[in-house]
Swiss-Prot record:
Protein name (Swiss-Prot/TrEMBL): CTP synthase
Residue numbers binding ATP: S14, L15, G16, K17, G18, I19, D71
Further remark: CTPSs have evolved a hybrid strategy for distinguishing between UTP and CTP. The overlapping regions of the product feedback inhibitory and substrate sites recognize a common feature in both compounds, the triphosphate moiety. To differentiate isosteric substrate and product pyrimidine rings, an additional pocket far from the expected kinase/ligase catalytic site, specifically recognizes the cytosine and ribose portions of the product inhibitor.
Catalytic activity, EC: 6.3.4.2
Ranges for region Amidoligase domain: 1-265
Enzyme class per UniProt: ligase
Annotated Mg(2+) binding sites: D71, E139
UniProt: L-glutamine binding residues: Y54, A353, F381, G382, M383, Q384, E404, R469
Reported regulation of activity: Allosterically activated by GTP, when glutamine is the substrate; GTP has no effect on the reaction when ammonia is the substrate. The allosteric effector GTP functions by stabilizing the protein conformation that binds the tetrahedral intermediate(s) formed during glutamine hydrolysis. Inhibited by the product CTP, via allosteric rather than competitive inhibition.
Reactions catalysed, as given in the entry: UTP + L-glutamine + ATP + H2O = CTP + L-glutamate + ADP + phosphate + 2 H(+); L-glutamine + H2O = L-glutamate + NH4(+); UTP + NH4(+) + ATP = CTP + ADP + phosphate + 2 H(+)
Keywords, comma-separated and alphabetical: ATP-binding, Glutamine amidotransferase, Ligase, Magnesium, Metal-binding, Nucleotide-binding, Pyrimidine biosynthesis
Annotated active site: C380, H514, E516
Listed pathway(s): Pyrimidine metabolism; CTP biosynthesis via de novo pathway; CTP from UDP: step 2/2
Source lineage: Bacteria, Pseudomonadati, Pseudomonadota, Alphaproteobacteria, Hyphomicrobiales
């Protein structure tokens, strides 16, 4: 039977509950346990798919096409286990499920209430489908004290009494701020956060305390006394230079041992930390450096590109180099010469996005990469714009654009109205809802034999995750191929372009899918490994 660790956060948001959950899962995995991680988000959106990147950050897409919280990306990267739609739920989805049942009459005339109906729905989500897991880690989004989180806290309180003894552990992540004028770390915010948690009937078993400097033993004892936890259960979580140091740091502080002790497990095998130590060594001892430019439109919030940042780092690990990222807001290139920003970088990456804003700037960046033979990777929107750039500047069709931007007879990129998902055709219309209506999840693509991309993958059949509503118009394939482009990846039915490359260039590839979503530190995605390898070669030309 699965054991449950409920992870809550207090004092402030963005403390890193997702990283803490992922790191703990990695430590339990290293001891040989089977671990599942789930994220419960208190917001009323059904999913984050229609939320602004500035509000939410990245939308992480799973193989089964679920649009989820970016923390699921951390879970996958740290554990190597692919998540699915059953690993993330929101208040919006819970309420929608309940209202649908009420309309069907499933509640037999009962008054539908937060307790028991909402809390029961939450508990069902937490406890269903865990037969193959030894531990289930549940991260509760938001901060203790938020009104939106109250039903979730009540649900996990109830589970403590409903599950067998020693089946539930509560871990609370807090912050100990350093007050420079006093020269002290302060415990009071943590005390008040724990008091807030205790007021809803939850007594934390473990305190994971974020701090920017070592916590004195006297302060740990103080937290132990006033928060009613064992001294050994006050774990310091010091700032580290990379998230891949976190599992090692938490193990040294005894987090995994304390978790097992709280469950009454005294004979657990020692964790095998070799691969984490190897990753940490390669990060801290690179054999060189390269610089790439990411030309985006959400660069004001780096969380909008979280998986991309990590995938680039994984490419660096594969090549034993540190990758420096120059973040460039695409709109700058609509006024400034791209050469001022791009002439010294070793690679250019144009990531996914939506909407016309910044598109012309990205097109100019792509043109610069193509003309100056700088390694280029275009992802999703980046591939679409690479096709538009080529049709304009190589084929001479000046009005080439996307139907997403404007009405034009030269729509190189258009709205997909239907596509094959497995054996079923899915259809969309321009007037349909935005939420959950894209081509989402893992799809097979066939790669052209002996193409650059097929050599990178080492195969001609791949399965990658997608998230897009628009697609390159297949009718422009012949035009682009006359000017040196190759449509090197297609959907199995030959209708949807999946990858392009430019023969007159050392490394120029665009893909319609999102390879960053499947990259892992222990298994870097081949496209990013190859892209960074190309930037290493480019750096030798400087």
């Amino acid at each position: 039977m699965a054991r449950y660790v409920f992870i809550t956060g207090g004092v402030v948001s963005s403390l890193g509950k997702g990283i803490a959950a992922a790191a703990l899962a990695a430590l339990l995995q290293a001891r040989g346990y089977r671990v599942r991680i789930r994220k419960l988000d208190p917001y009323l959106n059904v999913d984050p798919g229609t939320m602004s990147p500035y509000q939410h950050g990245e939308v992480f897409v799973t193989d089964d096409g679920s649009e989820t919280d970016l923390d699921l990306g951390h879970y996958e990267r740290f554990t190597g286990r692919s998540a699915n739609r059953h690993d993330n739920i929101t208040t919006g989805r819970i309420y929608r499920n309940i209202i649908e049942r009420e309309r069907r009459g499933d509640y037999l005339g009962a008054t539908v209430q937060v307790i028991p109906h909402v809390t029961d729905e939450i508990k069902n989500f937490i406890t269903t489908g865990n037969e193959e897991s030894d531990f289930v880690l549940c991260e509760i989004g938001g901060t203790v004290g938020d009104i939106e989180a109250m039903p979730f806290l009540e649900a996990i309180r109830q589970l403590h009494n409903e599950l067998p003894r020693q089946s539930v552990v509560y871990m609370h992540l807090t912050l100990m701020p350093y007050i420079s004028s006093a020269g002290e770390l302060k415990t009071k915010p943590t005390q008040h956060s724990v008091k807030e948690l205790q007021s809803v009937g939850i007594a934390p078993d473990i305190l994971l305390v974020r701090a920017d400097r070592p916590i004195p033993e006297s302060e740990r004892c103080k937290l132990s006394l006033f928060c009613n936890v064992r001294p050994s259960a006050v774990i310091q979580a010091l700032d580290v230079s990379t998230i891949y140091d976190v599992p090692i740091a938490y193990h040294k502080e005894g987090l995994d041992s304390e978790i097992l002790s709280a469950f009454g497990i005294d004979s657990a095998p020692e964790p095998k930390m070799d691969r984490w130590e190897d990753i940490a060594y390669r990060i801290h001892h690179p054999e060189g450096e390269v610089t790439i430019a990411i030309v985006g439109k959400y660069t004001g919030l780096k969380d909008a590109y979280k998986s991309l940042i990590e995938a680039v780092a994984h490419g660096g690990l594969a090549n034993k180099v540190k990758v420096n990222i120059e973040w460039i807001e695409a709109e700058i290139f609509e006024k400034e010469d791209p050469a001022l920003f791009l002439q010294k970088v070793h690679g250019i990456l144009v990531p996914g996005a939506f909407g016309v804003r910044g598109s012309e700037g990205k097109i100019r960046a792509i043109q610069f990469a193509r003309n100056h033979k700088i390694p280029f990777l275009g992802i999703c929107f980046g591939m679409q714009l690479a096709c538009i750039e080529a049709v304009r500047n190589l084929a001479g069709i000046e009005n080439a654009s996307s139907s997403e931007f404007c009405e034009t007879k030269d729509s190189v990129v258009g709205l997909m109205t239907e596509w094959l998902k497995g054996d079923v055709f899915e259809k969309r219309t321009a007037s349909g809802n935005l939420g959950g209506t894209m081509r989402l999840g893992a799809f097979i693509a066939q790669l052209k034999k002996d193409s650059h991309i097929s050599k990178i993958y080492g195969t001609t059949s791949i399965c990658e995750r997608h998230r897009h509503r628009y697609e390159v118009n297949i009718h422009y394939k012949d035009i682009l191929e006359r000017f040196g482009f190759v449509f090197s990846g297609m959907s199995p039915d030959g209708v949807l372009p999946e990858a392009i490359e430019y023969n007159n260039h050392p490394w120029f590839i665009g893909v319609q899918y999102h390879p960053e979503l499947k990259s892992r530190p222990f298994d870097p995605h081949p496209l990013f490994s190859s892209f960074i390898a190309a930037t290493v070669e480019q750096s030798r030309l400087f």
